Amino acid sequence: MCITVISIISLAGIIVMLQRHISRRKIKERFCLVSSGRPVGKSCLIMTMQSCGPIIDKALECLSSNDNIEVCKNHRTGSQTIDIISDKVRDCSADTEGKIGKTSLYCEYMLEATDKIAETTRHLVTSPDSYIPISYKCEIETIRGGIVRLSRLADGILGVDDDIIKIAGDTGLEKDFIEHSIAVHSKGMTHEDFDEGAPAYSYLMLLYYLHSFVSFFSQALRNIETNNKLKTA
């Protein structure tokens, strides 16, 4: 009986390991970086945005629907994706001395912010006193829609300067909305709400990480614009 139980547990462990290996392989194949005709900085930014966008989208969806199973799954699989993409960003952009380019550095920051977003939403949804007011949900759905839109526009980074300027403008609007949300939320918080682990504080930190993500994307776009101008000067 004991041998049978041990065998079942061992088999289950092997299956889990195989599933993780297959999952990581699929992620690597999906984001196998960019053909040799594309500029490296733009390619890294597109890959980063298109990998982070779905993770953030799912995290905010789980927060709105209070889905504690999917939010944990998203954090786990999202962390795997982020690790792989982070390695690819460094591999594709490092020079002979191993230094990473400025645009790719912003991509690293975007990946870190995405991991924090997935982690914070998991904490908010799974905490014992996880109550998300309707006002928060409306706010989150608005931010979610904005980030999904930016993720879909990411391919435009490879286009002409006018496309990049348009994306930068949309990014600025998203950034302004999150800044406004942070100001309103922090103004309405009590002294106790600022205790670490309090739902209101965790929500404030989520807004901060979302703002960081959009800000780093904006800075990466500006860096690409600057590089384009230098090349055409």
Outline where the language-model segments fall:
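Cytosolic, long alpha-helical scaffolding segments
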Residues: 1-4, 8-233
